[in-house]
Design a protein with these regions (language model features):
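Short flexible/disordered coil segments
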Residues: 87-103, 123, 158-167
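Short, charged, low-complexity loops and linkers
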Residues: 1-9
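Residue-level recognition of alpha-helical structural elements
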Residues: 3, 36, 74-81, 123
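Acidic catalytic patch
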Residues: 98-114
Length: 167
């Protein structure tokens, strides 16, 4: 199995899980559980557009965050959130499917001006910046839903909201 096939297998597991969570995001974009927390709408948009990292990492040798253009972080609606997620996911899936092991072994530099955050293989960078980053923010989003007393979908099995009542 190629590196791209392994990444795609994981991608195809994680994306539907993420979509189920995004489907539950309410139109309450300003909610913050703490003054230092990211507002719900911005967090949801960030999670929805994280798949776009693949179209940045896979075909390019580097990204300078000081010069890069990132998606608009403003929440419009849950429908737009899902449309953006689906579009970003489809583009990245194609980019992954078209990546060879040699492509994924190339170094990819992530910096902000002269400060270098990382300079690892595209495969490592994709796993870290996409899968790891996605899991982190998806967990945050689940906490926001819980604090708003909204049902949280099961991510890797049933959630407390999906378990049948004990008899």
């Amino acid at each position: 199995m190629s590196t791209a096939q392994v990444l795609l297998e994981n991608f195809d597991i994680e994306l539907p899980i993420t979509r189920r969570l995004l489907e539950r995001v309410p139109a309450n974009p300003d909610y913050k559980p703490h003054e230092k927390s990211m507002p719900l709408g911005r967090l949801a948009v960030h999670v929805a557009t994280l798949p776009a990292l693949g179209t940045l990492i896979l075909p390019t040798p580097e990204c300078d965050a000081a010069k890069a253009k990132f998606p608009d972080p403003n929440f419009v609606s849950t429908e737009k959130l899902l449309a953006d997620f689906d579009a970003c996911s489809a583009e990245t899936r194609i980019a992954l499917a078209n990546s060879s092991d040699a492509d994924l072994a190339h170094l990819w530099k992530f910096s902000a001006g002269d400060f270098v955050f990382s300079n690892n293989s595209r495969s490592c960078t994709f796993q870290h910046m996409f899968f790891g980053h996605l899991s982190h923010h998806r967990a945050q989003l689940g906490v926001y839903l819980r604090l708003l007393n909204l049902p949280v979908p099961g991510l890797y099995g049933p959630s407390a909201d999906e378990k049948p009542a004990a008899t």
